[in-house]
Swiss-Prot record:
This is Acetylglutamate kinase. Homodimer. Substrate binds at G43, G44, R65, N157. ATP binds at D180, V181, S182, G183, I184, L185, I208, I209, T210. Catalyzes the ATP-dependent phosphorylation of N-acetyl-L-glutamate. Keywords: Amino-acid biosynthesis, Arginine biosynthesis, ATP-binding, Cytoplasm, Kinase, Nucleotide-binding, Transferase. The keyword Zinc-finger does not apply. It comes from Klebsiella pneumoniae (strain 342). The gene is argB. Disulfide bonds: none annotated. It is found in: Cytoplasm. It is an enzyme of class 2 (transferase). InterPro entries: AceGlu_kinase-like_sf (IPR036393), AcgluKinase_fam (IPR004662), ArgB (IPR037528), Asp/Glu/Uridylate_kinase (IPR001048), NAGK-NC (IPR041731).
Amino acid sequence: MNPLIIKLGGVLLDSEEALERLFTALVNYREAHQRPLIIVHGGGCVVDELMKQLNLPVKKKNGLRVTPADQIDIITGALAGTANKTLLAWAKKHGISSVGLFLGDGDSVKVTQLDAELGHVGLAQPGSPALINTLLAGGYLPVVSSIGVTDEGQLMNVNADQAATALAATLGADLILLSDVSGILDGKGQRIAEMTAEKAEQLIEQGIITDGMIVKVNAALDAARALGRPVDIASWRHAEQLPALFNGTPIGTRILA
């Protein structure tokens, strides 16, 4: 089977119960299947907490975090440091051999500046699969933070959904976006099983899909188009369903190309 990228989002990193459920599901899945897995993560909650402690402002534009030059070092420390190593620690606790990476390692994902108004925010594009394929062949679980670096050596904060999409394109991998929500909800709060670009545009126009979920849906649509196959948005809350999800059974919203 193709490698599978599991993008972790939401408050997952803040919840020991959620991490325990996730890594138990990963162990169970890896014992029963040979499919290579890769984790890609952001860590907005970790960054927000740190910003609060340092009395620094948090500003967003169209769901993307504005990252001034005087904040990129702090955000890099939170994402490539604290968030990444927290996940490695959980992997270690569960007996999974893992390697912590950022997007620039092995040039796995190419990054350029997205928009000068956003500051150190990067646009992710496919890079080289060589390093991660080597790690997968060795039986390792790569855990990749959404910090990248430009060819000019500038650190960039990349939206983790978009980073995961670029890495999936690099590796020819399938993609699951795991978050706090069970999928995309309609106006009545009911989960939508399948979503097309046309349906997504309607719900955005109607104000049903808003803010960060717009970024998530657009990232999933971009991924589905780039990869030529569906992308799943699902919740990490139902651990018992995760092995089935990792094996290709939809449990949230399946985004169609």
